[in-house]
């Protein structure tokens, strides 16, 4: 009886391992598809920089940048899959290398939907960043037309 039980347990463990590998393979395929979709949807905006000489607002250009922005700022920009949203452009407002606020622009209206600093708190630069992005919405529009 013990041998039968061990044999059944070994078979069950093999089945679990096969299922685990299949799930991991599916996750890898999904990550690859997400990356390809991201490039297809957002690459036209890569290199776009808006500045007022002190604040630099740049497009997040990779899924890793979304992850790092979310982790650094304590926000859900990566966890909520903003890189998958076709009608959303995410920008990072910085002074030097420091992230000040993260900006979400609706690509249908070219309006700022959200703009927040660390842990979704607004900074002293909040209104200035929103004004800077809104005043330069034409740069986003030009990239959309050129694609």
For each predicted feature, which ranges?
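Catalytic-core elements of nucleic-acid end-processing and repair enzymes
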Residues: 1-147
């Amino acid at each position: 009886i013990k041998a039968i039980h061990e044999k059944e347990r070994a078979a069950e463990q093999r089945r679990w391992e096969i299922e685990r590998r299949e799930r991991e393979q599916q996750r890898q395929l999904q990550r690859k598809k997400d990356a390809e979709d991201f490039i297809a949807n957002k690459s036209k905006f890569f290199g776009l920089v808006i500045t007022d000489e002190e604040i630099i607002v740049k497009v997040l250009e990779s899924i890793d940048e979304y992850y790092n922005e979310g982790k650094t700022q304590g926000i859900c920009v990566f966890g909520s899959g903003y890189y998958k949203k076709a009608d959303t452009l995410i920008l990072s407002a910085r002074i030097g290398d420091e992230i000040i606020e993260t900006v979400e622009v609706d690509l249908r209206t070219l309006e700022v939907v959200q703009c927040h600093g660390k842990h979704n708190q607004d900074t002293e630069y909040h209104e200035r960043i929103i004004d800077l992005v809104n005043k330069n919405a034409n740069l986003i529009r030009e990239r959309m037309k050129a694609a």
